[in-house]
């Protein structure tokens, strides 16, 4: 069977705090490592989705409603459901990597990087489906 968990692939988080959230694989580790002897992936996703915006709203209200809260986390493949979709959001690999979990300051920086990139993509209007809450 081919490897389908690749960077850029959109996945659904199935378990834990971020269950039901959409995320993008930043780095996949199919064979596991010494500290995590199972296949896992570093993902970055949306914790709080942007709210609905209408034409009658002012600039301030639109700006406030267009905010996104991001997360960066390592998940076991068992807790991710891959979709057929891919998103090419260029996250900086030097900032968003597995080393960020050692230091809270680095983790904040990584979350900030993800947030900025997600908001940038949201404002261009591409991949609209990615920025909408999954209804289930």
Curated annotation (Swiss-Prot):
GO terms for biological process: erythrocyte differentiation; translation. Belongs to the eukaryotic ribosomal protein eL27 family. It is found in: Cytoplasm, Cytosol; Cytoplasm; Rough endoplasmic reticulum. It comes from the Eukaryota. InterPro entries: KOW, Ribosomal_eL27, Ribosomal_eL27_CS, Ribosomal_eL27_KOW, Ribosomal_eL27_sf, Translation_prot_SH3-like_sf. One of its GO terms (molecular function) is structural constituent of ribosome. GO terms for cellular component: cytoplasmic side of rough endoplasmic reticulum membrane; cytosol; large ribosomal subunit. Component of the large ribosomal subunit. This is Large ribosomal subunit protein eL27. Residues 5-40 form the KOW domain. SUPFAM superfamilies: Translation proteins SH3-like domain. The gene is rpl27. Component of the large ribosomal subunit. Keywords: Cytoplasm, Endoplasmic reticulum, Ribonucleoprotein, Ribosomal protein.
């Amino acid at each position: 069977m081919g490897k389908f968990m690749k960077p850029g692939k959109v996945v659904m988080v199935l378990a834990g705090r971020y269950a039901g959230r959409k995320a993008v694989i930043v780095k996949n580790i199919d064979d596991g490592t010494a500290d995590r002897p199972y296949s896992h992936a570093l993902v970055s996703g949306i914790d709080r989705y942007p709210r609905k915006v209408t034409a009658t709203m002012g600039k301030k209200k639109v700006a406030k409603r267009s905010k996104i809260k991001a997360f960066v986390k390592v998940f076991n493949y068992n807790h991710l459901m891959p979709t057929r979709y891919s998103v090419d959001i260029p996250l900086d690999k030097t900032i968003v990597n597995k080393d960020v979990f050692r230091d809270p300051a680095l983790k904040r920086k990584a979350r900030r990087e993800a947030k900025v990139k997600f908001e940038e993509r949201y404002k261009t209007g591409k991949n609209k489906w990615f920025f909408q809450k999954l209804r289930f």
